[in-house]
């Protein structure tokens, strides 16, 4: 029951923290120039988060079990005092097994990232084709862009929730806290980036709040579902296929699609601008480039500070 209480508290903290971080751009009134600057910073945060936090976290989750298993086997051999020639023979067998595991895991990394990216690409195309058929082509693209951006981040947040739920089922408080900190490090900037992008895209404030609420609810809801839905046998099965790492890398692919295909072109003036006579076509000013770079670096600095 203690595990259930801790996962409940972490889920509530995640929901509140994410929503508060996302509401900041809405709570402050920005001029058009300030809003562009905040949007650029948010875009940088999304890109930096995808590259510096989510991909490394996913890779770490994949390799953690293999590395721990290797360490455990060597310590066991030392404790049991196995003869040196026998130990060498066993270790060579294990080395072969581990090299096989590593090649398998390399494949998981690429496949998960690409599938996440392609999934969002297909969702984007299906969404935009539906909108194109019913609406004016001028307004079709940006509206599908908003939906894709939110959907991509929600898919990512749901994968985060699975990771936290799986961590809670290990009954180790330290593991839960590490996963929670890792998730909050990128959920808060992502919420800020999502809201600033939706504001820049000209969405109404009430609808932005709804988008933010869906994004904020995704991870806590999935963490609770994962924790409650995992039986002992399914926990073992999940750990065998490294489901947490695969889920995080899949979501990293969706995150990268959202950050690079939607948010960056929009901010750089290549996408739709709701004010055609603005400076959108000229690209970014020096200050905006500095804000973009700063946004990319913030998650990197935070992730360096956060150690496993």
From Swiss-Prot:
Keywords: Cell membrane, Cytoplasm, Glycoprotein, Golgi apparatus, Ion transport, Membrane, Mitochondrion, Nucleus, Transmembrane, Transmembrane helix, Transport, Zinc, Zinc transport. InterPro entries: ZIP, ZIP9. Its main location: Golgi. The chain crosses the membrane at residues 4-24, 35-55, 107-127, 147-167, 177-197, 211-231, 245-265, 287-307. It holds the Pfam family Zip. Glycans are attached at residues 29, 242. GO terms for molecular function: androgen binding; G protein-coupled receptor activity; zinc efflux transmembrane transporter activity; zinc ion transmembrane transporter activity. It is a multi-pass membrane protein. Transports zinc ions across cell and organelle membranes into the cytoplasm and regulates intracellular zinc homeostasis. Participates in the zinc ions efflux out of the secretory compartments. Regulates intracellular zinc level, resulting in the enhancement of AKT1 and MAPK3/MAPK1 (Erk1/2) phosphorylation in response to the BCR activation. Also functions as a membrane androgen receptor that mediates, through a G protein, the non-classical androgen signaling pathway, characterized by the activation of MAPK3/MAPK1 (Erk1/2) and transcription factors CREB1 or ATF1. This is Zinc transporter ZIP9. The lineage of its organism: Eukaryota, Metazoa, Chordata, Craniata, Vertebrata. The gene is Slc39a9.
